[in-house]
Amino acid sequence: MSLPPEKASELKQLIHQQLSKMDVHGRIREILAETIREELAPDQQHLSTEDLIKALRRRGIIDDVMKELNFVTDSVDQELPSSPKQTVGFDKQSTLKKTNVDPTRRYLYLQVLGGKAFLEHLQEPEPLPGQICSTFTLCLHYRNQRFRSKPVPCACEPDFHDGFLLEVHRESLGDGTRMADSTTMLSISDPIHMVLIKTDIFGETTLVASYFLEWRSVLGSENGVTNLTVELMGVGTESKVSVGILNIKLEMYPPLSQTLSQEVVNTQLALERQKTAEKERLFLVYAKQWWREYLQIRPSHNSRLVKIFAQDENGINRPVCSYVKPLRAGRLLDTPRQAARFVNVLGYERAPVIGGGGKQEQWCTLLAFLCRNKGDCEDHANLLCSLLLGYGLEAFVCVGTKAKGAPHAWVMTCGTDGTIMFWESLTGHRYIHKPTNPDGPPLAEQPKPLYPYRTIGCVFNHQMFLGNCQPSDAVETCIFDLNDESKWKPMSEEAIKSVCAPGATTSLPPFPPLCASTIDASVTSNEIEMQLRLLVSEHRKDLGLTTVWEDQLSYLLSPALASYEFERTTSISAGNEEFQDAIRRAVPDGHTFKGFPIHFVYRNARRAFATCLRSPFCEEIICCRGDQVRLAVRVRVFTYPESACAVWIMFACKYRSVL
């Protein structure tokens, strides 16, 4: 790791200060004199460096220095947003607290000082040193800044001890470089969004809690410091159940020269809540009126999937338009199709439901979806629509059904030439929509739909909401002329803007930026490949078979895996000819080659191997019997933002055909 010159000199200065504080130089001089007296033979002229190092180590000086310096590479667990602004998350080290701080800006220092009453983990035994255990991770977002705590073992009283430095600023013109005062900060209504994630021993993540912290109480506290007890509630069906308590300390830096009275702060917060409640009430009145008018067009509209409100992870009803917003990926994603691939490799998991019955509704806020790294079809569709809007496309989320009448959400883009394109967010596939004419002559050739969608009830984005009022809600017969009010009933854009525009209400969750991947693709690819080799060898050993690996054949599989991912990202196939030519050269006459590629969105080698064995063709390769059998396996991990990844694996074998 290379440091810029100014950082290197700063680090040297800190180390020098610490060494001076410990009087290390004086102790070294004492030990040097003592060593010369005791160990230098009369015929020796000088001590070697190695002799001195041994003496220092023997007397514990080196250990003392290392303990005092206490390098904390792991404690600075931070993620960089796609915007240039760097966020800082750090531990309790006082030296770190004083670095990387711009003295001309205002900061809020948020410390998490442990947790308690996580009763689900009351009986959890304390993990042994080195033992893999389930962990909690706290993720934060505040005004385009993302933070992540160190993972701590799950316990009734989890040992959270992290600090996060949040910059508080106004984006308005002229205020960018001015330090925010108390009055300015009181007008910044953005909450701190905190998401608690549990990761089990297999790497599976669970959303435990999602909490919006109102931080402005610190503006009315003495010395600009306050301690809070935050009760975290569960998600989904458990949104009324407490899952645990966090102890939080808030501190303004630099300290406020003038604090506000608590009465002023409380009045401002109450006024904001009142305004938000009134806007939401007026929108609800309007939505009810719109729905009545929609049903008057045709009574059968009552059975269509027209989704105006949806519950988030905390069980709060929000207008669906608030789940979508133009989202720019910075330099993390280059094209709309690459964005579709990124959304596709995020895991798919339906919201958990206790007991039987229908599907549990849970449209996650974007931070909860990204931190958990998986979600339902609506979460994927909302994110993909937001990214496509960021690329300047006219994109909408479609709500309807697919085969067997299962509710589903997907994305639609409208081209300037009238082309309607469906994007399936769970697979990355795209389909051109060509409507069939139900009144056409029986023998007339009609376009055959390739997409899996059956009906469509409504479409929406951050500015528009339209209900399908055509005679049939079948997708194949739908005309997507969204300006034709006889086919699509629109909601008032002003009404939507009043509750869904950025900053319109204080209850609107802000959209976080995407974070770059923290996964090293080469290292991870190699690790999974080594694990798979071991699993294959053990499996064949159980069958009484020997295993001979051919590294060159494994290497030749790389272009194929790269080609498969390129095709998924661009819909263009390339490089297959060179791969086939190389394989023909590598397989001698009279030998047979077999290959089996497979794709995963997780990095668990054992789980992937078990899945591969369920394929008869793959099992045939792994359990290959014959003369001169040579096996090969190649793994290629392709990383995407938010540490999402596409994992391509190819098993192959070549053997001499014996007839």
From Swiss-Prot:
Domain of life: Eukaryota
UniProt entry tagged with the keyword Cytoplasm: yes
GO process annotations (BP): regulation of centriole replication
The entry's keywords: Cytoplasm, Cytoskeleton, Phosphoprotein
Gene3D superfamilies noted in UniProt: 3.10.620.30
Positions bearing Phosphoserine: 75, 83
SUPFAM superfamilies, sorted: Cysteine proteinases
Compartments where located: Cytoplasm, Cytoskeleton, Microtubule organizing center, Centrosome; Cytoplasm, Cytoskeleton, Microtubule organizing center, Centrosome, Centriole
Alphabetized InterPro entries for the sequence: CEP76, CEP76-C2, CEP76_C, CEP76_N, CEPT76/DRC7_peptidase-like_dom, Papain-like_cys_pep_sf
One Gene Ontology cellular component annotation held by this UniProt entry: centriole
Membership in a protein family: Belongs to the CEP76 family.
Subunit structure: Interacts with CCP110 and CEP97.
Protein name: Centrosomal protein of 76 kDa
Annotated source species: Mus musculus (Mouse)
